């Protein structure tokens, strides 16, 4: 192959790579506007889309051999693994069958609806014996959905089996998944997947990718090992300065509360705090319910010196008086005007007119079709608060444990753990302390660098490393308590995953604290900002039972691996910001520092991108077990793939020499981090989908 052909091949490969990334991004936004069926027909399942991936695979394979990558075993196997995955996906797209089947109790069925339109027949029949829903003890929250079936083969052989969430029934290459059920529990809906070859080939690609990535990290000739030995990481001469400031709030005293108002005495309220009740499909201490109630209404976990328990008890005992207490937070100025109130706190009676008609009912009729209207959101929030008070007055909010012994009470240890968790605002403390330490230490570090003052191994540096270890341990305690209280791994919603990302950031900072002087300040800053977002987004995260489909150790691993990748990408981004700042200020005098930051970023890029890839495909395995398909082009899946593809480009320094240039590399990783933000926040708030926490 001549040089001209090689250049053409490289340009075609790069152009096609960029085109596919762009097409994927555009498709997610089109899906949000025109719906999933449209993008499936014109993008994901269209011939041109299949052709693009095919050409990319073929040209990529030719390019790999043209570059003689077989001489680098790990790199060669990594690229071959992607080709194997594409082949598996092609087999699935061409020969795989997917459909849905409905079966009534006591009946047999052998026909299913394939691709939503075609009636297809199974080589056997399946009979539904019973459909049941199991619940969490003492609650109405479903723990699992189970279809008990009998498979009847043509030779009269019968096979019994249960199909439930994360429990698939496989028979003669067909896989059955629990999808839905009839409201009267007399029938079940099962998803069907028949793709024995495509799944096997794709899984082979996943395994090959994981093994080659591990091989790359440990191979003596790999770029990762070369970066580990780079002298820039061995001669860092920076130090830290920390001025620790204790942040505290002046407590509101009981004297600030108007004493003329009838209230529930504190001595009785305190004694009731550990009383066990049913709330949000969990057994909780009364303190949890009271705290949620007060925080929902007033925006704070206490009210003018009264504890949350006193607030709830006072509403119960003296409802007529408390209906005229302005403690219902209304943030929307427009809604304040419509309710006729001054300020941001309303009374319960402000929501009803002189004829005792509910004011929000008429408002809702005018805004219910405006999904993005701020007033609509304000009306919904206010209505939830009024509904909460109504439930309390009707006796449906507080439910005691049944006396028949059907529900086992919580142990005293678990009750005390939840009371402690409610009392200590882990997220608030951590984000305030971490951001304060992070900003001060980074400011001092930059001052020292500008002045060329080396202060290596100082007392302040050791203190900083000790403090970030303390922050990690304190954060670990909060995450552990959250998991212990909820009896599950706390990674099932947006708040919990952000908490875990922050934990990963602190963990990485502690792990790499000796590699660069910037690691510890970055660890404090990055974790602090993540915790701030978590705190602002959900100041009162309710602990609820996990959805049945989320009960999977594979899902927990999937989320954990991706969160660690996000944390590393965050460090790389902060490295880029500082490196570009120093380069713009005086690149010659700060050359050593810039080199250290660049090497550190390139070093972290390996585990970050490898974890991203492995996390994506662990998620694909979980999806195949739970939903019957390993890839659905859901917006979150698509943007995770985009993130992986974008960051993977930075490894190709020989094909794209610009990545060897310091400024270009750091600008690239800054722009690339936008894909991480889009994957985590953008999809949730803009695009939606099965993975969205909306």
Where are the predicted features?
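Solvent-exposed, non-transmembrane regions of integral membrane proteins
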Residues: 1-694
